[in-house]
Amino acid sequence: MKKRVVIVVGVLVLLIVLLTLIICFKPREVKDLNLAENIAMKIKEGSLTNTGATVIITDLSGNENLDLINKKFKIDYKKNNKWYRLESKIKNEVIVSTSDNDVDNGNNTYTQEINWERYYGKLDKGHYRIVKEVKTDLYIAAEFDI
């Protein structure tokens, strides 16, 4: 009888651990982004690799309260027509950021180099987007394929 109780408790503990792991490592679906109007971000032709890219940001909004060349970015990936946040390889890393290689090209156009290898490693083949927050809950994004 005692042996049976130990087995049942062991199985229950194992199930709880497995459920916890499944919940913790389930990809986080991303809600719809509130995209900024009259601001475009695109990948500069010839710059895309599986470790980074150069983006060109064009601002025709006239809104001076936006932080267009902030260093923060996130990468999402698309699977089954849903977007999921790519998790950083660096434990407890909340903010991922670019290098200081950003240039004001004039005419409300900015160029920024983004190297995501430190945070995400080399990206596998798939459909992705770079997401930058330009104001609280206001975003710009550029989709790309590796």
List where the protein language model places each region.
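Primarily secretory-pathway and cell-envelope proteins
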Residues: I7-V8, L12-I90, E133-I146
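Short, solvent-exposed, Trp/other aromatic-anchored flexible loops in extracytoplasmic proteins
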Residues: K89-H127, E133
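Sequence-level detector for tyrosine residue identity
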Residues: Y77, Y84, Y110, Y119-Y120, ...
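Positively charged n-region of N-terminal signal peptides that target proteins for export
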Residues: M1-R4
